[in-house]
């Protein structure tokens, strides 16, 4: 279960009045309040692991936070989680590697028994293979327990390159790797577990059956289960 704190903050503050959350104070105050709702959601999920994310505008979210503000937010988040019972904490927190705070956050999270997902997003294109491999290596060096990349393809060749990078990284890195090519063109990468991607993201319909993807190209969870069953890969629980 993925919970994006900054998306919850947007809803709490009111989308019409605050189309882009830019005040760090408003964000942090609301995050601390929202965490109590996250704890309740985790309890209601009956043992389903919770991944906590704080996705800003640069990573496809809505909040406008600079690197310093992002680091402060993550420190506050972990300080708050320290007061929770270990069994109620999220199993992992997602940190954008380009923010520069991954080593600090990874060390603090490790003390709390919370895993760290190192993330890299590129909504403009698919970097060269060597650049993607360096990003994955950096996540490992800086303490990530899982290295995840999401990129935008301009062609089928870009998708194929990403799958190749994924396969090589999965075979050589000491931590699991997750990689996805966004948009309709990259959908195959979200269900092609045979190339080594350790996890994928799927959309769960709301009570009215409506589907709202958090990133372009995400598929409904039932379709993802069906694809994983056909193509190989452990179905989502």
Q: Where are the language model's segments positioned?
A:
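Cofactor- and metal-binding active-site motifs of prokaryotic enzymes
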Residues: 50, 55-77, 184-197, 202-209
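Catalytic alpha/beta core domains of metabolic enzymes, predominantly
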Residues: 98-237
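Acidic (Asp/Glu)-rich catalytic clusters
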Residues: 31-47, 75-88, 104-113, 139-141
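Structural signal for hydrophobic packing residues in well-ordered secondary-structure cores
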Residues: 35, 39-45, 93, 166, ...
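Catalytic beta/alpha-barrel core
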Residues: 2-4, 20-33, 53-55, 70-101, ...
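Conserved N-terminal beta1-alpha1 strand-loop-helix module at the mouth
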Residues: 1-60, 67
């Amino acid at each position: 279960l993925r919970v994006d704190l900054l998306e919850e903050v947007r809803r709490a503050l009111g989308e019409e009045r605050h189309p882009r959350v830019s005040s760090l104070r408003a964000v942090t105050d609301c995050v601390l309040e929202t965490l109590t709702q996250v704890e309740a959601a985790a309890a209601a999920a009956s043992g389903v692991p919770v991944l906590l994310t704080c996705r800003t505008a640069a990573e496809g979210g809505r909040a406008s936070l600079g690197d310093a503000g992002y680091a402060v937010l993550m420190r506050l988040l972990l300080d708050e989680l320290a007061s929770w019972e270990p069994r109620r904490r999220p199993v992992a927190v997602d940190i954008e590697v380009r923010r520069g705070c991954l080593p600090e956050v990874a060390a603090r999270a490790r003390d709390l028994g919370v895993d760290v997902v190192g993330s890299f997003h590129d909504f403009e294109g698919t970097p060269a293979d060597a650049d993607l491999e360096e990003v994955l290596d950096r996540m490992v060096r800086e303490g990530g327990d899982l290295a995840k990349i999401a990129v935008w393809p301009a062609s089928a060749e870009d998708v194929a390159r990403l799958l190749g990078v994924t396969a090589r990284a999965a075979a050589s890195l000491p931590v699991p790797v997750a990689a996805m090519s966004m948009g309709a063109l990259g959908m195959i990468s979200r269900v092609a577990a045979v190339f080594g991607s350790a996890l994928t993201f799927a959309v769960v319909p709301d009570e009215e059956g409506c589907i709202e993807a958090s990133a372009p190209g995400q598929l409904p969870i039932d379709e993802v289960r069906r694809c994983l069953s056909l193509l190989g890969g452990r179905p989502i629980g």
